[in-house]
């Protein structure tokens, strides 16, 4: 079911030196980065190793000239009530053939030292061909598996509008019962985004939906903000 909703979100992102510090140094064939902001994204930039609502950002990233990289990140320190310490470690390999073709492979391990049974892994791969980015990720979480396909088609000229898409299949280890009877064991969700910069503001028109509807939405736990179809217009501007 498509919910006829238009959400307008205006976000002003204020950045300071305190929350955007990056220390970088070359160590022979290695490039070391220590940062309080994410210094890397995976699968050709289509996978983000962070989570919403993080209370602390800090970590290191070490890259070798051969294309191998390794790093560790603490997206949350468990300071706020109801949150737990999380330490993410990743290992990957990125190789460009030329300026138009490159690929990337890797794995992220999500660790919760105080909640060890919740540890999980995410495997990812990405390919860039003539400005188009394609990616895939598979998450092996406790009691569920998520498989995601990404596509970023780049910017269409002369309009300057980009197109990116995401499609995810969710398999639940334990079926979720719904009020009207029956249960949900698997579902899909997807989103398509049209970004465009305008006078220093990043505009994003996003449509998202899922395969669930009606009472089934009580079992939704996917990537979108809600189960039903939603159109969102988001405006962001960063001040430095």
Predicted region positions:
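Short glycine/proline- and aromatic-enriched beta-strand/turn motifs that initiate or cap beta-hairpins
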Residues: 20-77
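Detector for outer-membrane/organellar transmembrane beta-barrel domains
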Residues: 25-26, 119-182
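Outer-membrane beta-barrel pore domains and translocons
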Residues: 35-41, 73-77, 94, 108-112, ...
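Solvent-exposed loop/turn segments connecting transmembrane beta-strands
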Residues: 46-53, 77-86, 110-120, 138-149, ...
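Residue-level signature of outer-membrane beta-barrel architecture
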Residues: 60-64, 93-95, 127-129, 136, ...
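Repeated loop/turn-to-beta-strand initiation elements of outer-membrane beta-barrel proteins
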Residues: 66-72, 99-105, 131-136, 158-165, ...
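Outer-membrane beta-barrel "beta-signal"
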Residues: 130-131, 192-200, 225-240
């Amino acid at each position: 079911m498509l919910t006829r909703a238009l959400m307008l979100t205006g976000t002003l992102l204020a950045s300071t030196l305190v929350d955007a510090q990056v220390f970088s140094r070359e160590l022979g064939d290695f490039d070391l980065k220590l940062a309080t902001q994410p210094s890397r994204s995976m699968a050709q930039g289509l996978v983000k190793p962070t989570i919403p609502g993080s209370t602390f950002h800090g970590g290191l990233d070490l890259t070798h000239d051969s294309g191998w990289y390794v790093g560790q990140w603490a997206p949350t320190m468990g300071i706020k009530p109801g949150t737990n310490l999380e330490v993410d470690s990743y290992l990957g390999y990125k190789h460009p053939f030329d300026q138009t073709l490159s690929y990337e492979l890797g794995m992220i391990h999500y660790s919760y030292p105080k909640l060890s049974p919740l540890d999980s892994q995410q495997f990812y791969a990405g390919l860039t061909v003539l400005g188009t980015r394609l990616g895939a990720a598979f998450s092996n979480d406790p009691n569920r598996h998520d498989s995601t396909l990404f596509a970023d088609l780049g910017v269409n000229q002369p309009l300057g509008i980009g197109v990116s898409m995401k499609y995810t299949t969710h398999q639940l280890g334990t079926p979720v019962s719904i009020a009207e009877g029956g249960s949900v064991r698997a579902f899909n969700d997807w989103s398509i985004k049209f970004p465009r910069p305008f006078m220093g503001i990043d505009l994003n028109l996003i449509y998202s939906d899922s395969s669930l509807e009606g009472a089934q939405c009580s079992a939704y736990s996917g990537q979108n903000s809600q189960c039903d179809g939603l159109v969102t217009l988001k405006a962001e501007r960063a001040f430095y």
